[in-house]
Amino acid sequence: MARIAGVNIPTNKRVLIALQYIHGIGPKIASEIIEKVKIAEDRRVNQLSDQEVLQIREIIDRDYVVEGDLRRETGINIKRLMDLGCYRGLRHRRGLPVRGQRTHTNARTRKGPAKAIAGKKK
């Protein structure tokens, strides 16, 4: 198992898919990394040489924000919105949908399980 950016990459999968196990790397960025290292998309992780794994690791460290740094940055951005007291920050603070979705019905994922209200049954 190769270890890149603190994540164990599965060895039996294609490089394009295996790189997506790293938080912050999706299909587009994974294909960009493969292109920079000049690896065929159908190669598997266990077929990579140590030099190629090292190149991938260097490119990710140099060019992309991934894993813990990305999670920290996202958390700081959300905290900043909450401290500002803007609409999006208030929605985060209250645990409601942030991007304009309806809340009269639905939004159960964001709001949590339904709470029983006394006297609601007929």
Curated annotation (Swiss-Prot):
The keyword RNA-binding applies. One of its GO terms (molecular function) is tRNA binding. Keywords: Ribonucleoprotein, Ribosomal protein, RNA-binding, rRNA-binding, tRNA-binding. SUPFAM superfamilies: S13-like H2TH domain (SSF46946). Residues 99-122 are annotated as: Disordered. InterPro entries: Rbsml_uS13_C, Ribosomal_uS13, Ribosomal_uS13-like_H2TH, Ribosomal_uS13_bac-type, Ribosomal_uS13_CS. GO terms for cellular component: cytosol; small ribosomal subunit. One of its GO terms (biological process) is translation. Pfam families: Ribosomal_S13. HAMAP family: Ribosomal_uS13 (MF_01315). Part of the 30S ribosomal subunit. Forms a loose heterodimer with protein S19. Forms two bridges to the 50S subunit in the 70S ribosome. Located at the top of the head of the 30S subunit, it contacts several helices of the 16S rRNA. In the 70S ribosome it contacts the 23S rRNA (bridge B1a) and protein L5 of the 50S subunit (bridge B1b), connecting the 2 subunits; these bridges are implicated in subunit movement. Contacts the tRNAs in the A and P-sites. Belongs to the universal ribosomal protein uS13 family. This is Small ribosomal subunit protein uS13.
